[in-house]
Amino acid sequence: MDSRYDQLSPVPPLTAITKNLIILCVAVYFIDFILTHLGVQIQGYYLKELLGLVPSLVKEKGWVWQFATYIFMHGHHLHLLLNMLILWYFGSEIELKLGRKQFLFYFLLCGIGAGLFNYSVNLLFSDVNRLSHPIIGASGAIFGILAAYGIFFAERYFLVFFVFPMKAKYFVLLMALVELVTGVESNASDNIAHFAHIGGMFVGAIYIYLRYIQPKGPKSGQSKRDIEREKLKKQFTLIVNDKGQKEEKGPYWN
């Protein structure tokens, strides 16, 4: 058997924050579904218009909360199902890696960043009619999670379409390329916010690099001497001499 199959990504557990995010998205979907089919409006707006990201409403009315609330809205049950499956599969792994609080912060950061990125692209390049269409879904945040997965588990294999083994880092790069090309060529004709996906990946990758990958610089107030002492401490070892006593060996300082 191909050794790559020994490195395939395992099915992760359903972790606490990921589970709660899924529950929240499902609950919001059904509330929106019921209210929409009953024709219920709030101050003349349907729930998707209030909580989805509508560029014209953000620009004209200052409804900035939409940059966060749009994440939990979904337009169709298949849209919801696909996003939640991906959130469970990749999100649980990243939650285990970052911890609950950091994962929740990261999820919201990527979602809001994706919304801001897509909003900016719409203002700069879209026609006026496009600005009135709500952007909804957790996909931007989920693409940020994919970026984190591709960084933290770069060498791990998993089956693309349940058939083709591919390293995570290559899969993430491929997805980024597909979204970029599709976003430029589609001109929004497929009703998918490709630039929200790209924005989520970009924000997520930058954050992971700065927060976890880039070597940390000196702490505030540290002198050069303190920095050197910390470096030396990391090299310090204890050995036992032939008399059975602990003996210090390594760099010394005073």
What is each PLM-predicted segment?
Residues 131-152, 168, 196:
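Membrane-interface micro-motifs in multi-pass membrane enzymes
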Residues 96, 152-164, 214-218:
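Alpha-helical transmembrane bundle and helix-membrane interface signal
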Residues 4-8, 87-95, 154-160:
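C-terminal ends of transmembrane helices
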Residues 102-109, 137-139, 163-170:
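Cytoplasmic-side transmembrane-helix entry/capping segments in multi-pass membrane proteins
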Residues 84-91, 144-148, 175-178:
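Membrane-cytosol interface at the C-terminal ends of transmembrane alpha helices
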